[in-house]
Amino acid sequence: MEESKVKDLTAYKNRFEEDASSFSEFQARDFVKELKNQGKTDEAIEVGRTFLEMAPELKGYINYFGYALYNKYINIDDEEISKNESLFYGILEEIAKYCKQERYSPLEAAVNKAIKHVLKADPVDYKKLSELLDYLDAPTLEDKPFVNKDGKEFESKKEKWYRMKVRALYELESYRTCVETANIAFTYNLKWHYNNLNWVKYYRASSLVELGRYEEAENEFIALQGHFNAVDAFEILYKLYMNTNREDDAYTLLIDKFFKGGFDYKNIEDYKKISAMAKAKGQDKAHVLAECLIKKLEEENGKTYEADVDLADYADLTASDAFDRVYSEVVYHLENYITRHEGKVVFYNHDKNFGSIFQDGEENLFFRQADFLDDEEVEKYDVVEYSVIKTYDRKRQQMSSKAVLLKVLYEEINY
C-alpha cells in the first residue's frame, strides 16, 4: 500500500508571510491541521497564535491549534510537568480560553491530564483540583458510563466530575457549596459506580455537620451505617451526639456496639469511651475496671497506658477478666447509663427471629432476637425492657427506629 502523500504547504507559508489576515476559514483550518498532522507542532502553534492576533474572526483552526499545544506542553510525563508547572498550567489556561467543550476539542483531555497530575501529589492540592474542574461545564458532560474495549464499565465523565468536585469543596471548607453541588448531582439520572454515590453522600453529610444542620447530617450518616464501610459512621454519629448535648443517644449507640463487639484489641477506642462514660455517670467501679481493661490490653499488645485511677486492687486481673467485669457492670446495669423503656411484644416470627413492640400512637418498634442481652426465649405478649436507636429502613427508603439491648421482664397474662 502506498504511503499517503504529504501535502505541500509552500503556498500557505508564502501567503502567511505576506498577509496572515488574508486566509479564508478553510485555508486557516487546513494550514494548521496539516502542520499539526505533519508533526510540525511549533509551527502550528506559531501560526495559530498569529491567526488569533491577525484574524480573530477565524475559528475553524482553533481545535487543531489547541491540540498542538496539548501535544507539546500537556501530554507529557509528570516529571516534565513538575519541572515547570507554571508553564504547564499557563498553556492549559490558554487552551481553556480558546477551545470550547465540544467534540474534537482538546479541552477535556487537557483538563483530565492536569487532574491526574494533581491527584498524584501527596497531599492533594484541592484548591487546584477545584480550579481545574471549573474549566469544564458539568451539566453538559457525558453522562453515559464509559465502556472499554473489554466491555468493562466505568464511571461517566459527569459522575467523575461531581465525585471529585464535592470532595474538593469539602476539603476547602466550602461547606454550603459542597451541599448544593451534591444536591445538583442527585438530580441527574446517573448510573453510579463503585462507592461514588456513598462518597458524595458522606461529604455532603459532613458538610451539613459543619453548617449546623445536625438532624439532616444524622439521618444521612445513619443511612450510610452498615452500608458503606469505607467510613466509620459510628464514630461520626457518636461525636455528633456528644457535641450536640445528646449524650443519651451517644451512650446508647456506644453500649450497643460494646455489647456486640466482644473482647478484641481492635475495640480499644470503644473501651476508652466506655471508661469516659462511666466516669461521667459517676459509676466509679465501672470506670476503674474499664481503666484496668485498657491498661492490661495495651500492655498485652506491647504498649503502655497511664490510667487516671489507682488500679492496685485489680493488679491480678488479665485483660480478658477485666473485660468480663466491665461487661457485667455496664450491660447488666444499663439504667445507670442510658434511658430504658418497657413495652409488650405484639409480634414475633420464630423462623426469622425478629418481632415488634407495641408503641401507643406510634408505629410498632422493630427488634431482632440477636439484640437481646441474653439468649432468652421470646414470645408474643412478653413485656421487655429496651433502649432505642435510630436506623434506616432500606425497604421503605426512610428513617426508622429499632429496639436494642433488650431483656425479658415478664409475660403479660392479661391480654
Regions found by a protein language model. Name each.
Residues 303-344, 407-415:
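Short boundary/loop segments of OB/S1/cold-shock single-stranded nucleic-acid-binding domains
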Residues 38, 72, 172, 211, ...:
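Structural motif corresponding to the intra-repeat A-B loop/turn of tetratricopeptide repeats
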Residues 14-23, 49-57, 95-102, 137-142, ...:
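Solenoid-like repeat scaffolds
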Residues 387-415:
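OB-fold/S1-family single-stranded nucleic acid-binding modules
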Residues 360-378:
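Beta-strand/loop nucleic-acid-binding surfaces
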Residues 44, 129, 178, 217, ...:
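Single-residue signature of alpha-solenoid repeat helices
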Residues 20-29, 57-63, 103-111, 153-164, ...:
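Generic helix N-cap/helix-start motif at coil->alpha-helix transitions
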Residues 35, 69, 114-119, 169, ...:
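Residue at a conserved register position within TPR or TPR-like alpha-solenoid repeats
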